[in-house]
Amino acid sequence: MAIAFEHVTYTYQAGTPMAHTALTDVSLTVPDRGYLAIIGHTGSGKSTLIQQLNALLKPTSGTIKIDEFTITPETTNAALKPLRQHVGMVFQFPENQLFEETVRQDIAFGPKNFGMADADALALADEMLTTVGLDQSYAERSPFELSGGQMRRVAIAGVLAMQPKVLVLDEPTAGLDPQGRQEMMRLFARLHQEQGLTIVLVTHQMEDVAQYAEQVAVMHEGRLMKFGTPADVFSNREWLQDHQLDVPQAAQFARRLRDRGLTFPKQPLTADQLADYLAQQWAQRGADHV
């Protein structure tokens, strides 16, 4: 599903002395099956922005279009129910939302709540377990007996059971160890590639942005400051640092190597890109000495 924000402004407690404008005139587009990363320091408006996508918050002014759905300040909650079946939200620490007695029941809750027959919802829950990399031995276990990483997979399976076409991820790897973070990001990449989901990712992990995102939106004090490819956004380290951000670690390391005389055809953003460039450098040096 394609997404378009058109001059979106959002003010908390509008019309009161406590009014605070968290988004100002944000416009951006994400193509169908696109992968957008949203970055920015704490308080920049990232979470407020993504909560507009299934109208947990509705814009104070402006319009959001998600395929045939349109969200405006006047959109009614009744009109939003079909949209919310298509937009899946994974918040920070989603395992805190688990509540059913068994893993299978927890995953099946959403589909049943939207009218799916119990038997179909339970069968779908088993399918989603496999999708997130858990076997059927987990189905009848209490979700509260699982490890933190397993609980998070169950929570994500519950979102996927709604069969969304857009998956919105708010710091989905927060609190995970490096291996768990990599496994989670690979899962989302597989869903993006194999199921054609449109992904919107909020993260502080610049390595994940460089590795997976096709577009990057930089938020600062509620405004969209930059929008482009990872290569575009990470091309100016000084500008990023002015906005309390930095380039990925591979780019930082490449800069140190460049200071020592190595050259790169273009800025490496991932460890794989850096390794490839270094291998080419060593191969060329070897050929020059033959």
From Swiss-Prot:
Q: Does the keyword Cell membrane apply?
A: yes
* Gene3D superfamilies named in the record: P-loop containing nucleotide triphosphate hydrolases
The answer to whether keyword Lipoprotein applies is: no
Print the keywords alphabetically: ATP-binding, Cell membrane, Membrane, Nucleotide-binding, Translocase, Transport
Write down the SUPFAM superfamilies for this protein, in alphabetical order.
P-loop containing nucleoside triphosphate hydrolases (SSF52540)
Where does the chain bind ATP?
G40, H41, T42, G43, S44, G45, K46, S47
**Enzyme class per UniProt:** translocase
Listed under GO cellular component are: ATP-binding cassette (ABC) transporter complex
Q: Which Pfam family would be a valid example here?
A: ABC_tran
Query: Known SMART domains for this protein?
Result: AAA (SM00382)
Q: Where on the tree of life does the source sit, at the highest rank?
A: Bacteria
The record's annotation in InterPro entries points to:
AAA+_ATPase (IPR003593), ABC_transporter-like_ATP-bd (IPR003439), ABC_transporter-like_CS (IPR017871), ABC_transpr_CbiO/EcfA_su (IPR015856), ECF_ABC_transporter_ATP-bd (IPR050095), EcfA2 (IPR030946), P-loop_NTPase (IPR027417)
Where is this chain's protein located in or outside the cell? Cell membrane
MF-aspect GO terms: ATP binding; ATP hydrolysis activity; ATPase-coupled transmembrane transporter activity
Q: What does this protein do?
A: ATP-binding (A) component of a common energy-coupling factor (ECF) ABC-transporter complex. Unlike classic ABC transporters this ECF transporter provides the energy necessary to transport a number of different substrates.
Q: Which family does it belong to?
A: Belongs to the ABC transporter superfamily. Energy-coupling factor EcfA family.
Note the PANTHER family from the entry.
ENERGY-COUPLING FACTOR TRANSPORTER ATP-BINDING PROTEIN ECFA2, HEAVY METAL TRANSPORTER
User: How is this protein organized at the quaternary level?
Assistant: Forms a stable energy-coupling factor (ECF) transporter complex composed of 2 membrane-embedded substrate-binding proteins (S component), 2 ATP-binding proteins (A component) and 2 transmembrane proteins (T component).
Protein name, please?
A: Energy-coupling factor transporter ATP-binding protein EcfA2
Organism for this UniProt entry: Levilactobacillus brevis (strain ATCC 367 / BCRC 12310 / CIP 105137 / JCM 1170 / LMG 11437 / NCIMB 947 / NCTC 947)
Gene name of the encoded protein: ecfA2
